From Swiss-Prot:
Keywords: Transferase, tRNA processing. Belongs to the class I-like SAM-binding methyltransferase superfamily. CmoB family. Its EC number is 2.5.1.-. This is tRNA U34 carboxymethyltransferase. Homotetramer. GO terms for biological process: tRNA wobble uridine modification. The keyword DNA-binding does not apply. InterPro entries: CmoB (IPR010017), Mo5U34_MeTrfas-like (IPR027555), SAM-dependent_MTases_sf (IPR029063). HAMAP family: tRNA_carboxymethyltr_CmoB. It comes from Salmonella typhi.
Length: 323
């Protein structure tokens, strides 16, 4: 059974305590009414994993846990089997005592692009919106964050996160809540807020930017990573039924247009930190994610286009400050 009591106890003692006015009731309602049909199967996989405290833990350069003496073949097989019960694994990679989870996305590459542009994370309280399996939460802790909180309504991601946490010695510096950003009150409590790979899924992208702003303390930093297209500050792609086979893609602005949106929402010191094309080396099918991936979503005769004829995915990182 996945519980949230440790998180409630933690925030009761800090500047997030006002969240307790709404959060426990929301989680209780989720537990009663909204659990996925496979949630019990997934949470059982977490429950059956052994609790291991790493002898060596590296969250600075990767998410890697090692034991002082190698685990037995039987222990490794048990861990491997239980983690495979939580497939597909999309965000990673993770190296856990000799079990290497080769995820669909090389999320470490994204982190390497983002990290040099961030304010120092040491001692910060961080929110990661749409955090997936929580890979970047652990990297934030590795970079010195005091507390990293992720929100993502996808329940498989919650179970993947809790599985990794259990294998990292039940580390309580990072937490994942099965909520969407629209369920959060205006907490105004986080030093840094990340939204990576979310904006293009929002029907109202400016509303999403306002929601992110409402979570930041004054002088807090927003890190926004999303799909973009080439163009000037007035360029926005509005795809038809699908974009790269995804149905729920609504608006893909140019990076200059996105900068303008952020300024319109009251952010300052907005800068475009990075723009890069997504490659089939960064997003691909693996034995831990066996269905279609980026290579299947691109035009086989022109890899600069999606199968629908739109520009192939490229992603930008923008950094902004809430005054």
């Amino acid at each position: 059974m996945i519980e949230f009591g440790n998180f409630y106890q933690l925030i009761a003692k800090n500047h997030l305590s006002h969240w307790l006015e709404t959060l426990p009731a929301q989680i209780a309602a989720w537990q009663r009414e909204q659990q996925h049909g496979l949630f019990k199967q997934w949470s059982n996989a977490v429950e059956f994993l052994p609790e291991i405290t790493p002898w060596r833990l590296d969250l600075l350069h990767s998410v890697t846990a090692e034991s002082e003496t190698p685990l037995s073949e039987g222990q490794l097989k048990r861990i491997d089997t239980l983690l495979r019960n939580l497939m597909p694994w999309r965000k990673g990679p993770f190296s856990l005592y000799g079990v290497d989870i080769d995820t669909e996305w090389r999320s470490d590459w994204k982190w390497d692009r983002v990290l040099p542009h961030l304010s120092d994370l040491t001692g910060r309280t961080i929110l990661d919106v749409g955090c997936g399996s929580g890979y970047h939460l652990w990297r934030m802790i590795g970079a010195g964050a005091h507390l990293a909180v992720g929100i993502d309504p996808t329940q498989l991601f919650l179970c993947q996160f809790e599985a990794v946490r259990k294998l990292l010695g039940n580390d309580q510096r990072a937490h994942l809540l099965p909520l969407g950003i629209e369920q959060l009150p205006a907490l105004k409590a986080f030093d840094t807020v990340f939204s990576m790979g979310v904006l293009y899924h929002r029907r109202s992208p400016l509303e999403h930017l306002w929601q992110l702003k409402d979570q930041l303390v004054n002088e807090g930093e927003l890190v926004l990573e999303t799909l973009v297209v080439d163009g000037d500050e007035n360029t926005v792609l509005v795809p038809g039924d699908r974009y790269a086979q995804m149905r729920n893609v609504y608006f893909i602005p140019s990076a200059p247009a996105l900068k303008k949106w952020l300024e319109k929402c009251g952010f300052v010191d907005v800068r475009i930190a990075d723009v890069c094309v997504t490659t089939t080396e960064e997003q691909r099918r693996t034995e831990w994610m066996v269905t279609e991936s980026l290579a299947d979503f691109l035009d086989p005769n022109d890899r600069s286009k999606t199968v629908e004829g739109y520009p192939a995915p490229q992603r930008a990182v923008l950094i902004a400050r809430k005054p």
